[in-house]
């Protein structure tokens, strides 16, 4: 999906949004990912380049509910564009605006770094949110998976074989 380089406002709501600036913020992001997908709690440290995060070519934006990280948006930058690398929301915070808060807050704050626009690949579950934030489908993505429960397949828009 593609979003032209125009201004976006941070979404109002019950969540505070902040850019990850400490290693403890990355640990909070890892917990969101682990909650969302049942992965290892140290996933961020193993998958994302911490050197790139420290250098600023990767940004991590957190939507916070009290002391609890609810959603995370990872943004990458290059050639005047921003790529939405990954979005995750803890299941207990879904359908409350956490993902909208994290993504809109990150995009609003990074506008000067990405005047050309933003792009992402959307799952069927995330596409309605991205459309509401001004992203347009360039070409539909067809997910191919092996296995999974009926519920998991439905979440990504795949049909059982």
Stretch-by-stretch model annotation:
Residues 32-43:
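Helix-loop element at the rim of GNAT/NAT acetyltransferase active sites that forms part
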Residues 86-91, 95-110, 132:
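Conserved acetyl-CoA-binding loop-helix of GNAT-fold acetyltransferases
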Residues 110-122:
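Conserved GNAT acetyl-CoA-binding A-motif
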Residues 100, 124-140, 147:
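Conserved active-site alpha-helix within GNAT-family acetyltransferase domains
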Residues 26-31:
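An amphipathic alpha-helix signature
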Residues 153-161:
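Actinobacteria-biased recognition of intrinsically disordered, low-complexity terminal regions
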Residues 1-24, 120-122, 142-146:
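Acyl-donor-binding surface of acyltransferase catalytic domains
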Residues 41-90:
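A conserved beta-strand-loop-helix scaffold within acyl/acetyltransferase catalytic domains
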């Amino acid at each position: 999906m593609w979003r032209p380089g125009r201004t976006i406002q941070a979404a109002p709501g019950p969540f505070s949004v902040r850019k990850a600036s400490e290693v403890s913020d990355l640990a909070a992001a890892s917990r969101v990912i682990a909650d969302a997908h049942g992965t290892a709690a140290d996933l961020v440290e193993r998958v994302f380049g911490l050197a790139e995060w420290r250098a600023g070519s990767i940004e991590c934006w957190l939507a916070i509910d009290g002391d609890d990280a609810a959603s995370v948006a990872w943004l990458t930058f290059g050639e005047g564009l921003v790529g939405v690398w990954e979005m995750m929301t803890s299941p207990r915070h879904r359908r409350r605006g956490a993902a909208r808060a994290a993504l809109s807050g990150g995009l609003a704050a990074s506008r000067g770094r990405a005047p050309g626009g933003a792009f992402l690949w959307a799952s069927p579950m995330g596409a309605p949110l991205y459309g509401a934030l001004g992203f347009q489908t360039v070409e539909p993505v067809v997910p191919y998976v092996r296995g999974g429960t009926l519920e998991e397949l439905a979440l990504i828009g795949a049909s059982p074989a």
